[in-house]
Amino acid sequence: MTPEEADFFLSSYRFDLPPEQIAQFPPEERGASRLLVMPREGAADPRSELRHAAFGDLPDLLPPDALIVANNSRVLQARLLGLRATGGKVEFLLLTPLPLVMERAAPDKASGADAFRAEAEGLVRCGGSVREGETLAFGAGIRVTVLESGPFGKRRVRLAWRGDLGKAFAATGHIPLPPYIKRADGEEDGSRYQTIYARDDKSGSVAAPTAGLHFTPAMREKLEARGFEWAEVTLYVGYGTFSPVRGEDIRGHRMHREYVEVPEATAEAVARARARGRPVAAVGTTSVRALEGVAELCGRVQPYTGWTDIFLYPGRSFRVVDAILTNFHLPESSLLMLVSAFAGRERTLAAYAEAVARGYRFFSYGDAMLIK
């Protein structure tokens, strides 16, 4: 089998990672992370080309005059703990981005002047099976009625609430930490599992755009002083980001959909950068998916509001992004395949092996990697 043929096999994306290198907590100080720098192109074994740096060195390491594009979505306290009518415990995770829920919201006049309802999608977990038509009760007056069962625990539901739904989730919900973080969410996660530039009106992600967690106000100021332009997109990170690729031939994988917003100012910034030959540096795979997804749908980056299900794996081309700042990803994950599409599978896995050997911290609260 040639390396090119191996690119399409799920088992080609395995690597060994000691459990103790999966970061369970953020670093003591935001931005106090390590940064592994790898050229996008080069030998199959990139170890001699790697640079081991600190995230604080980022302004010296980014491509000069780059346009930086980041995802400004905010993680919603989307995990609710409540009770069934039988008294049994139940957990609900809202999967539909909050702005879409609000677009669908209709007054529930039978329940009062400030009562609303809307259909949405979510995950329901409990000790037994949940019946269609069953209503579940949660804090802050949120009620969830199961309308239809779907695959992998998904449910179509009707939400009912009073007043401001975002405030209700904030009052009673929990931060939905990834499954590889083996602890309950704590008070610290409310701030540390959000980027400093996450917008209140962009709440609805069920996972953080984790490459952005390293940025501090001081780093933003330093980048601005060095002349880097900053632009933002919104991609509401869905729970599908943790969904495994199930088939051995990855070309048959169907990617989850995520809701994207590219504002006019960002589309114009990308167009200016491309016209002037300036590189575009994406903060995280979610920003990559937003930019490349819109470019695939529209032929270029333009103002857009809608869904993307783009799946980037080796052999797929990149139309927009020239550099990626990203965390380290799970074995056999679609995000590892995206990075491999950008820098080559063998190079990426060799860099990961070096990161493991040197004790880098992995996944959401872990260290970062810059590929340029």
Where are these regions (language model features)?
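A cross-family signal for N-terminal binding/gating loops and helix N-caps
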Residues: 1-372
